A protein has these predicted regions:
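FMN-binding flavodoxin-like domain, especially the glycine-rich phosphate-binding loop
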Residues: 2-3, 17, 23-29, 34, ...
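Short beta-strand/turn micro-motifs composed of small residues
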Residues: 8-10, 89
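Glycine-rich NAD(P) Rossmann-fold beta1-alpha1 loop
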Residues: 12-16
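Short beta->alpha linker loops
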Residues: 10, 38-42
């Protein structure tokens, strides 16, 4: 069984709901999902032992929230090169944060990224059936690529 870490932060609870639904999709695919708020991760050693990493942040002012920026500096020290990665987040006006995370994971961390790209979802859609199903599908697809 593969082990996937979903590390996220959320201000309104929407990105947290996305994280939970992505984890459901991973579990539906028969893999293990662990969800952690990035503020709970204190050192790079806590990022070891996973087969894939999915990082999530809402978008504010076309950017990541500050806690995600700090977390990415921590994650860079964890040597995640070659691991499977994905990124997600909620947004109101622009969905730039997941793309920034995805690009950082791919180009700075040298991770093997999901061929789905980053996944963003308008906040108004997060609570709906289709939005939650899309999150589950993202989780399942990451597992499909893990093998």
């Amino acid at each position: 069984m593969k082990k996937v870490l979903i590390a996220y932060d959320s201000r309104t609870g929407k990105t947290e709901k996305m994280a939970e639904s992505i984890a459901e999709g991973i579990r539906m695919a028969g893999q293990q999902a662990e969800i952690k708020k990035i503020t709970q991760i204190k050192n790079e050693a806590e990022l070891q032992g996973y087969d894939a990493y999915v990082f999530g942040s809402p978008t504010y002012h076309r950017d990541l929230i500050g806690t995600m920026k700090t977390f990415l500096f921590l994650a860079q020290k964890a040597n995640l090169e070659g691991k499977m990665g994905g990124a997600f987040g909620s947004y109101t006006h622009s969905g730039d944060a997941p793309t920034i995370i995805f690009d950082t994971m791919e180009h700075v961390f040298k991770m093997k990224m999901t061929n789905l790209g980053s996944f963003n979802l308008k906040e108004a859609l997060v609570d709906g059936t289709e939005g939650l199903r899309a999150c589950q599908d993202y989780g399942k697809s990451i597992c499909d690529q893990l093998g």
